[in-house]
Regions:
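Short, solvent-exposed loop/turn segments at secondary-structure junctions
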Residues: 57-58, 78, 111-113, 142-145
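Short, acidic, metal-binding catalytic loop of nucleotide-sugar glycosyltransferases
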Residues: 39-48
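Active-site beta-to-alpha loop of glycosyltransferases that engages the nucleotide-sugar donor
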Residues: 19, 25-36, 56
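Active-site-proximal specificity loops/subdomain of glycosyltransferases
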Residues: 59-107, 116
């Protein structure tokens, strides 16, 4: 576009090639947030790129599972710290295998959502694709509505 005094040039804020991105979580007795997690990351990344571990055969599949990859594993009663270590080991090992197919893997708790600053005017997948990530990148965490007032 040109103007008598100015030449307008369209500038793309990010120069990037879209990366293939997966999201990974584990849930137990948290269908409320799991359905929201699948909805949010499914729209951002595509349901087929979501990986969910349900902790226990007593867990129901989410109503909106769609094309998500869901694995149900037997629940083992453990102390909180043992359970956390077991969960992190499982998810880390699985994430490592996902890197055979994906450029990036997002790992979050089921009640955690990565969002791009609206001022960036871009989607999560486009924003992450624009970054030059060598090992890892992390976001700022904020609890919203953790406790009722």
């Amino acid at each position: 576009m040109t103007h008598k005094r100015f030449k307008f040039v369209h500038i793309t804020p990010f120069n990037y090639q879209m990366k293939k991105i997966a999201a990974l979580t584990m849930a137990r007795n948290d269908s409320f947030f799991l359905e929201k997690w699948i909805d949010y990351y499914g729209k951002e990344l595509g349901e087929e790129n979501l990986y969910v571990f349900l902790d226990g055969n007593d867990q129901n599949l989410p109503a909106n599972a769609g094309k998500s990859n869901i694995t149900v594993r037997s629940h083992t009663q453990m102390s909180r710290s043992e359970g956390d270590k077991d969960r992190i080991a499982l998810l880390s090992e699985f994430a490592a295998t996902l890197f055979e197919q994906y450029d990036l893997v997002i790992g979050t708790d089921v009640d955690e959502f990565l969002a791009v600053d609206p001022k960036c005017n871009t989607s999560l997948s486009k924003y992450l694709s624009s970054l030059n990530i060598e090992t890892s990148v992390s976001g700022l965490g904020v609890d919203v509505g953790q406790h009722s007032v």
